[in-house]
Amino acid sequence: MESQNIRIRLKAFDHRVLDQSTREIVSTAKRTGAQVRGPIPLPTRIEKFTVNRSPHIDKKSREQFEIRTHKRLLDIVDPTPQTVDALMKLDLAAGVDVEIKL
């Protein structure tokens, strides 16, 4: 029978909060006896927005803003039922998007 894997994909705008959440997930999984692969840093998505500084004229004067979406990937190999329960009860920081695939 093929072993069950849990793939966790994390996204956040702040890389420090993302790394802290990743460390919490890894320590929880290792404490319950599962093997963890990762965290694997995925490419950062950079969105740039250009707007006019003035509402009426002066097209040459513009301002640029950017938002960076940082991503990490974790694989939990052979999770135990205790691992799944611990991950469900885990309270991560606000601002971190978590996608879990079995």
UniProtKB/Swiss-Prot annotation:
Molecular function as annotated in GO: structural constituent of ribosome; tRNA binding
GO biological process: translation
UniProt keyword list: Ribonucleoprotein, Ribosomal protein
Recorded GO CC terms: ribonucleoprotein complex; ribosome
Lineage top rank: taxon: Bacteria
Any Pfam family hit: Ribosomal_S10
Known role: Involved in the binding of tRNA to the ribosomes.
Assembly description: Part of the 30S ribosomal subunit.
Similarity comment: family membership: Belongs to the universal ribosomal protein uS10 family.
PANTHER family: 30S RIBOSOMAL PROTEIN S10 FAMILY MEMBER
HAMAP family assigned: Ribosomal_uS10 (MF_00508)
Protein name: Small ribosomal subunit protein uS10
Native species: Rhodospirillum rubrum (strain ATCC 11170 / ATH 1.1.1 / DSM 467 / LMG 4362 / NCIMB 8255 / S1)
Taxonomic placement: Bacteria, Pseudomonadati, Pseudomonadota, Alphaproteobacteria, Rhodospirillales
